[in-house]
Structures are given as structure tokens and as C-alpha cells.
């Protein structure tokens, strides 16, 4: 009995002194494992006299239970201490400055496009859309560009092998709109167009807005009034404007619109901003509208051109280089 008590006291002291889980596991094996000290005492019960076995067995069981409880408690203590140490090392310093979320914004071309569409919406124009991959009929023939007409060369077209093409203007949307609606009608088409051209003021892909009005009594004076109001609303100031005769196959007469633009040095020069004209009778006929009864006017503008003027950008290519330093100015 005294031997078991002495063994238990030494073992409890060793358990309390264990500093790591590995040390504690080694003690458990040495005490309670198959070859452990307490297990050996149990195996020796059969060698004791019968009158001593009961008391010795009870003492050994009490010792085993005490050691098992001590091992479990010490294991929990060591695990808690290890967790506290790890958490202390991973503690977040709440006094550190936070990471600022970057503020985004619309691309300047998108902002300009939305501004143009909103102005024409106030004037009663409905926004319509169409495919960027067009057929020859909607992009050229219906707009008074017969096959082999030299005016087609002005468009620097991207063709596919099956005869389809990347639209060179949004005028094809006007043809589709007139096919689906009866006069009177008033619409604008906005989106990407493609031409094989690239320099400081041209891009192979750019954005265009075109407008169309067809009614029984529309005339060139209505066209001038509409565009004058648009230019004033877009730039938020009045400009001296002039309409120069020009050629576009789908209008007759056709004109280009210039505004008197003030230079940084204070001088003024004429700056082209729009193309326009009265819808050609052949275009109306191609969509089943009687040109003897209805007349109309059309106009078109490059969105990047207006964005360059509005934001003072000299090189159109800056809009497509994705330079965050440049784009952040407009966020």
C-alpha cells in the first residue's frame, strides 16, 4: 500500500512539472501504458495473498483515477497556455491606420456618352441599339452607298470572310429603326463603331452617336435649331456656329458643323464637331417611307471628340491606354 501511495505522489509531482504536451504524453505512457508502472502493479495483484488483494486493487484503481485526472487537467492547462501565447503573437493592433478603399468612377467616354444621350432624351429622342457586326445592306446599301461606290472607301471598313463587317457607323441602327417604326419618329443610336484608322485623333474603335428625325414638315431650320440647342446644353455656354456644305451619301444637302472654339492663348478658331443633313430620299425609299410625304434630318458625332473638348484632352489614344493616373482625374 505504501509503495502505491509513494508511486502516486511521485507521479503526480512529475505531471505537475511537465512543461510540454510531449513530456506529458511520455509520462502517461510510463505510468498508464501497457508497460507502465500502474499497469505493472495491477498485473502483480495475483501474486498477493487473497486477504490483501481487495485493498491493494482499490488503492491501485484510486491511484490510476487520480493520475488520469491529473494528466487531463495538466494537458488542458498546457493547451490553454499555448493558445494564449499564439493569440498574443497574432494580436491585431487596432491603432494601426486602416487600408483605404480606392474610389472608382465612370470612364470619361462613358460619362460623355451618357451626357449626350441625356440631352437628346430631353429633346424627345428615343435611344435605340443594334448589332456591331453588320451586313452590307444595313451598313451601306440602304444608306445610299451602292456597290463599288467610291464613298465606301472613306470608311476604311473591317470585313469578315462571309461578307459581314464591323459597322463603320451607327447609321445601320437608324435603318432598322425605320423598318420597325412608322413616321413620325425621333431616335438616336449610340455605341461602338470600327474603322481601320489610328493616330492622335483617330482610333480603330470609337464611339458614335447618331440622331434621326422623320416627319411630314421637318426642314433644315429644325436641324439647325436642334444641334444649336444640343451644343449649348453640352458645353453649358453659347457658341458661334457655322454649317459648311459637305457630302455624305445618306443626306442631301449635307453639312459639317463648326463651333468657334477659344484657344488657351485667347484666340478663336473654327473646330469641326458634327456632320448632318436632310435624309436622302433614297434612304427613305429603302425602308418603305414615301419621300414625297415625309422628310427628315440626321446627324452624327464622335463621342471621344466631345470628351476631348470637354476635358481638355489632346490625344484621343489616352482614353484607351487604361492609365489609372489619367483616368483617376475623372473619378
Curated annotation (Swiss-Prot):
Gene Ontology MF term list: ATP binding; magnesium ion binding; phenylalanine-tRNA ligase activity; tRNA binding
Highest taxon in the source lineage: Bacteria
SUPFAM superfamilies referenced in this protein's UniProt entry, alphabetically: Class II aaRS and biotin synthetases, tRNA-binding arm
Manner of cofactor binding, per the entry note: Binds 2 magnesium ions per tetramer.
One family name in Pfam for this protein: Phe_tRNA-synt_N
Single GO biological process annotation from the record: phenylalanyl-tRNA aminoacylation
Positions contributing to Mg(2+) binding: 252
Subunit structure, interactors included: Tetramer of two alpha and two beta subunits.
Identification of the protein by name: Phenylalanine--tRNA ligase alpha subunit
Amino acid at each position: 500500500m505504501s509503495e502505491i501511495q509513494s508511486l502516486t505522489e511521485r507521479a503526480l509531482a512529475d505531471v505537475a512539472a511537465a512543461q510540454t504536451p510531449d513530456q506529458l504524453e511520455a509520462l502517461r505512457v510510463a505510468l498508464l501504458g501497457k508497460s507502465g508502472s500502474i499497469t505493472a502493479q495491477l498485473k502483480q495483484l495475483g501474486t498477493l495473498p487473497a486477504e490483501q488483494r481487495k485493498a491493494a486493487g482499490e488503492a491501485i484503481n484510486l491511484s490510476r483515477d487520480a493520475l488520469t485526472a491529473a494528466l487531463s487537467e495538466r494537458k488542458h492547462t498546457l493547451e490553454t497556455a499555448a493558445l494564449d501565447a499564439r493569440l498574443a503573437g497574432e494580436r491585431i493592433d487596432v491603432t494601426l491606420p486602416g487600408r483605404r478603399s480606392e474610389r472608382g468612377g465612370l470612364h470619361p467616354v462613358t460619362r460623355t456618352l451618357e451626357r449626350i444621350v441625356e440631352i437628346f432624351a430631353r429633346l424627345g429622342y428615343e435611344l435605340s441599339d443594334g448589332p456591331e457586326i453588320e451586313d452590307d445592306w444595313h451598313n451601306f446599301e440602304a444608306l445610299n452607298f451602292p456597290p463599288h461606290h467610291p464613298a465606301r472607301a472613306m470608311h476604311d471598313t473591317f470585313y469578315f470572310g462571309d461578307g459581314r463587317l464591323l459597322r463603320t457607323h451607327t447609321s445601320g441602327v437608324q435603318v432598322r429603326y425605320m423598318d420597325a417604326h412608322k413616321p413620325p419618329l425621333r431616335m438616336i443610336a449610340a455605341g461602338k463603331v470600327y474603322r481601320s484608322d489610328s493616330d492622335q485623333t483617330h482610333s480603330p474603335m470609337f464611339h458614335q452617336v447618331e440622331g434621326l428625325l422623320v416627319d411630314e414638315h421637318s426642314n433644315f431650320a429644325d436641324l439647325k435649331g436642334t444641334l444649336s440647342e444640343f451644343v449649348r446644353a453640352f458645353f453649358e455656354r453659347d457658341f458661334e456656329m457655322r454649317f459648311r456644305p459637305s457630302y455624305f451619301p445618306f443626306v442631301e444637302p449635307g453639312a459639317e458643323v463648326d463651333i468657334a472654339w477659344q484657344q488657351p492663348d485667347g484666340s478663336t478658331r473654327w473646330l469641326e464637331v458634327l456632320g448632318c443633313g436632310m435624309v436622302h430620299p433614297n434612304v427613305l425609299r429603302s425602308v418603305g417611307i414615301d419621300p414625297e410625304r415625309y422628310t427628315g434630318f440626321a446627324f452624327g458625332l464622335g463621342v471621344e471628340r466631345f470628351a476631348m473638348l470637354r476635358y481638355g484632352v489632346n490625344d484621343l489614344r489616352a482614353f484607351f491606354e487604361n492609365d489609372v493616373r489619367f483616368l483617376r482625374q475623372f473619378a
